[in-house]
Amino acid sequence: MEHTFEALGLRAALVTALAEQGITAPTEIQQKMIPEILSGKDVIGRSETGSGKTLAYLLPIFEKLDLSIRGTQAIILTPTHELAAQVYHQAELLQENAGIAAGCVLLIGAAGIGRQLEKLKAKPRIVVGSVGRILDLIRKKKIQAHLVRTIVLDEGDRLMDDGNVEDVAAVIKTTLKERQIVLLSASVSGEAKAKAAAMMKADAVDLEAKSGGIVPKGIHHYYILSAHREKFA
């Protein structure tokens, strides 16, 4: 089997965009998940940190976007503002390098809602953010949930805990039954898997990648201290 992004069914523009980031071959979790997501199946994916889970769902989301339709086609839910920001920036990088005018917006409680409402007027196709803020904006009819084709639960084990699962279920219920649900995490408990399965279609697939991550050994990490109000300007 040929282990290339082209063989997984991705358009040339996305493959070129990945090359711009120095990514030339799919990881194990990407090889397993991308075809299933492209086929429309609900998916539970497990793979360790640094294994490429974010691109495992972003790439098929971009591949499936209908650019003739303006409005939210994919919602990516995360348990933390920091993870939401990371996913958003990867989505922005992907659309810039691929030349695909997807339209992405970051919706988190740490940022002013006024600016977010302004960005939603442009009818972005990909929405990334915290469960509470996205649910609030759906209820305010600022997000057209009936257009949503894919919902991603990133770090899904945490989104299935008692503090999040009701809001996650509420977001899902606002969308059409034909929508796709994708859950990813480094590990998924039996309880979390059961909760997720109750929200998914009967033919959902459960995938696991056991190979190591792609974070280079010896990499140096840096951080900058800043005031809370400055983190998501």
Segments (PLM) and residue ranges:
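Conserved catalytic network of the ASCE P-loop NTPase/AAA+ motor domain
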Residues: E36, D66-R70, E96-I100, E118-A122, ...
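Short hydrophobic/aromatic beta-strand immediately N-terminal to the Walker A/P-loop
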Residues: I44-R46, I75, V182
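Post-DEXD/H (motif II) to motif III coupling segment of the RecA-like Helicase ATP-binding lobe
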Residues: Q144-G212
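Conserved nucleic-acid-binding Ia/Ib motif block in the N-terminal RecA-like helicase ATPase lobe
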Residues: T16, E20, R70-R139, L147-T150, ...
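Walker A/P-loop NTP-binding motif
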Residues: Q31-V43, T54-I69, H89-Q95, L135
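Conserved interdomain hinge at the start of the Helicase C-terminal
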Residues: G218-A233
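Conserved pre-motif I regulatory segment
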Residues: M1-R46
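The conserved Walker
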Residues: S47-S51
